[in-house]
Swiss-Prot record:
InterPro entries per record: EF-4, EFG_III/V, EFG_V-like, EFTu-like_2, G_TR_CS, GUFP, LepA_C_sf, LepA_CTD
Species name: Prochlorococcus marinus (strain MIT 9215)
HAMAP family given in the database record: GUFP, LepA
Protein name: Elongation factor 4
Residues reported to bind GTP: 19-24, 136-139
PROSITE patterns associated with the record: G_TR_1 (PS00301), G_TR_2 (PS51722)
Disulfide-bond pairs as recorded: none
């Protein structure tokens, strides 16, 4: 398979916002080059998880090799490296872009450029990729190709005079795209003589062969009889097989510079073969690895608890298995008096969190309770020490700390002009600091805010979409920690702290949140035989309180007339019993109550 010359190889990826038709376009390219037979074709061929097909998003990267006979009657090999389009997975995107020389920029001709597309285009420009603008869905009645071309020129500064109009659904313009890839995307550099370096741009776990690594050979060549060394994890392996994805795996003996392939080497866990790591030969290693490798750091944390305590071992096993294929997932065991045993998990972002939760419930058949998402806070203690805390209930008491710092993000929101006011209102509610506002075109605007990450991870995205009828899009990146007037808000039920409901809030918002929490709990906790106080507190100060009145048995029902002292005696005895019960009784908080409160405006 390696007899192809480097000048005939084209490596490209597709950049697009969610829903702009990237997966459908990939399907058409596979079909038109004859890579996938008509009868094997299914919608979104490269999105292998059910979850991806259902949500219509790409989570795991896939790669496919196509052969294409161009108009100059030469045969070319086109390697499509698929990229996820969501902000949580931007590190994966940057790695796939590093493995390419060109990119198709797919924009929906009826919707225009969106935030996520822009973020990825800038990444592509940083990697010096040749960008080919493609306007998709031109068959839709609302499509306005000329207006969108102008938008691309104004926002991104790309020349769109030779942009391609296409409709992936009907197959219009697919041939033009293939020709443009051959003509405009530069071939890889011919570096076969240099020491071997290959970039890992994806890996997944196969229960039979261990981790399967997708890589692009940057320089030198890789033979299946050699031992490899992974430069970041410092581990070495003997190769079991190497091959190409066409799009099913086919074994080959050797791959050289410029080619894209997969390898299996009995690697135990995805964490050993991280995205962005460099593969080199054990006997003649390269001097330095490829630049840009980062370990994935979780930004959002939450507790995962099984609804049934017996499922705890199953949850542990499932998380271990999931971590084999998802190196960005971090977890550690945690216990809570209200929820029992569970895990504290770290994720790249909200979408990542939802996907992990859904995969656990779907693929491993678990019922889970998820506590409210939180971020990592930096707590400055009195002795000039700093600690980082991801679980609000473990933050030290006010007398032991000087201040709490929280992570801030710089957020860019792209939206039509008419939603300007409502978006600015939303950002102000979420303690955003206004930085700048730019008009991209006459009717589209960019708002730039600096906002605490904690305000973004709850339901900012949903709110933004609902306030703008789905037209706004956003992207953000971390800019560091800042001091704020933050407090730990505890909820006490019958004078006991309920850990899962502890949160860190801004002092100005604490009363409103505390008030609504106790009112909601009052509705949801069933009455007991004794009175239950529910309180919201900051340190030792109670800021809001409600109580659930006791159920009472009518102890006087058997007294007909008679002396009043008899009745008093019975009532006194009942009151004494209630007092003892209150001192000893435990309040069982139903899980529905926790769920409802966690959903309550998190």
């Amino acid at each position: 398979m390696t007899d192809i010359s480097v000048s005939k190889i084209r490596n490209f990826c597709i950049i697009a916002h969610i829903d702009h038709g990237k997966s459908t376009l990939a399907d058409r390219l596979l079909q038109d080059t004859g890579t996938v037979q008509q009868r094997d074709m299914q919608e979104q061929f490269l999105d292998s998880m059910d979850l991806e097909r259902e949500r219509g998003i790409t989570i795991k990267l896939q790669a496919a090799r196509m052969k294409y006979k161009a108009d100059d009657s030469q045969e070319y090999v086109l390697n499509l490296i698929d990229t996820p389009g969501h902000v949580d997975f931007s590190y994966e995107v940057s790695r796939s872009l590093q493995a390419c020389e060109g990119a198709l920029l797919v924009v929906d001709a009826s919707q225009g450029v969106e935030a996520q597309t822009l973020a990825n285009v800038y990444l592509a420009l940083e990697n010096n990729l040749e960008i080919i603008p493609v306007l998709n869905k031109v068959d839709l009645p609302g499509a306005d190709a000329e207006k969108i071309k102008q938008e691309i020129e104004e926002i991104i500064g790309l020349d769109t005079s030779n942009a391609i109009n296409c409709s992936a659904k009907t197959g219009v313009g697919i041939k033009d795209i293939l020709e443009a890839i051959v003509r405009r995307v530069p071939p890889p550099q011919d570096e076969i003589k240099l020491p071997t370096k290959a970039l890992i741009f994806d890996s997944y776990y196969d229960p039979y062969r261990g981790v399967i690594v997708y890589f692009r050979v940057i320089s030198g060549s890789l033979n299946k009889r050699e031992k490899i060394l992974l430069m970041a994890s410092k581990k070495n392996y003997e190769l079991d097989e190497i091959g190409i994805m066409a799009p099913d795996q086919q074994q080959v003996d050797e791959l050289h510079a410029g080619e894209v392939g997969y390898l299996a080497a009995s690697i135990k866990s995805v964490a050993d073969a991280r995205v962005g790591d460099t593969i080199t030969l054990l006997n003649s290693p390269a001097n330095e690895p490829l630049p840009g490798y980062k370990t994935a750091n979780p930004m959002v944390f939450c507790g995962l608890f099984p609804t049934d305590a017996d499922q705890f071992p199953d949850l542990r096993v499932s998380l271990e298995k999931l971590q084999l294929s998802d190196a960005a997932l971090k977890y550690e065991p945690e216990t809570s008096s209200a929820m029992g045993f569970g895990f504290r998990c770290g994720f790249l972002g909200l979408l990542h969190m939802e996907i992990v939760q859904e995969r656990l419930e779907r693929e491993y058949d678990l019922d889970l309770i998820v506590t409210a998402p939180s971020v990592i806070y930096k707590v400055n203690l009195n002795q000039q020490e700093n600690i980082f805390i991801d679980n609000p209930s473990t933050i030290p008491d006010p007398q032991l700390r000087e201040s709490i710092e929280e992570p801030y993000v710089k957020m860019e929101i792209y939206a039509p002009n008419e939603f300007n006011g409502t978006l600015m209102g939303l950002c102000q509610e979420r303690r955003g600091v206004f930085i700048d506002m730019k008009y991209i075109t006459t009717d589209r605007v960019t708002l730039i805010y600096e906002i605490p990450l904690a305000e973004v991870v709850t339901d900012f995205f949903d709110q933004m979409k609902s306030r703008t009828q789905g037209y706004a899009s956003m992207e953000y990146h971390l800019i560091g920690y800042r001091k704020n007037d933050l407090v730990r808000l505890d909820v006490l039920i019958n004078s006991e702290r309920a850990d899962p409901l502890t949160s860190i809030v801004h002092k100005d918002k604490a009363y409103g949140i505390g008030r609504s929490l106790v009112e909601k709990l009052k509705e949801l906790i069933p009455k007991q035989q004794f009175k239950i106080p529910i309180q919201a507190s900051i340190g030792s100060r109670i800021i809001a309180s409600e109580s659930i009145s006791a159920l009472r048995k009518d102890v006087l029902s058997k007294c007909y007339g008679g002396d009043i002292s008899r009745k008093k005696k019975l009532l006194k005895k009942q009151a004494k019993g209630k007092k003892r019960m209150k001192a000893m009784g435990k309040v069982e908080v139903p899980q529905e109550a926790f769920m409802a409160v966690l959903k309550l405006n998190q």
